[in-house]
Amino acid sequence: MAKKSMIEREKKRIKLTKKYALKRATLLKKYQTEESFNLKLELHSKIQKLPRNSAKTRIRNRCWKTGRPRGVFRDFGLSRHVFREMAHQCLLPGVTKSSW
């Protein structure tokens, strides 16, 4: 199980990302379409002044049950260990063990 501080840090990042998503998107759009070099520098500095954790790339997918950061299935939000256990217990609807 992951440390609670790491899980809380991820929650904080998700919250910040949602808060600054619109502002970041508009600044990036202006930056990409701008032709003037001086205005581009100004927009770049505004983007850099936004909180670092408000960037979407800083978010790490974690298992919602254990907080494990690696081996997470996106569809279920579970790590591979928990996914296997829950699938064996028939707690995941529509998931069956394959056989051929």
Curated annotation (Swiss-Prot):
Key words, A-Z: Chloroplast, Plastid, Ribonucleoprotein, Ribosomal protein, RNA-binding, rRNA-binding
One GO term of the biological process aspect: translation
Top-level division of the source organism's lineage: Eukaryota
Database matches in PROSITE patterns: RIBOSOMAL_S14 (PS00527)
The keyword Ribosomal protein appears for this protein: yes
Gene3D superfamilies the record matches: 1.10.287.1480
Cross-referenced InterPro entries: Ribosomal_uS14 (IPR001209), Ribosomal_uS14_bac/plastid (IPR023036), Ribosomal_uS14_CS (IPR018271)
Main location: plastid
GO cellular component: chloroplast; small ribosomal subunit
Spans through the membrane: none
Gene Ontology molecular-function annotations: rRNA binding; structural constituent of ribosome
Subcellular location: Plastid, Chloroplast
UniProt subunit comment: Part of the 30S ribosomal subunit.
PANTHER family: 30S RIBOSOMAL PROTEIN S14, SMALL RIBOSOMAL SUBUNIT PROTEIN US14M
Role description: Binds 16S rRNA, required for the assembly of 30S particles.
The family this protein is said to belong to: Belongs to the universal ribosomal protein uS14 family.
Protein name: Small ribosomal subunit protein uS14c
Provenance organism: Phaeodactylum tricornutum (strain CCAP 1055/1)
Organism phylogeny: Eukaryota, Sar, Stramenopiles, Ochrophyta, Bacillariophyta
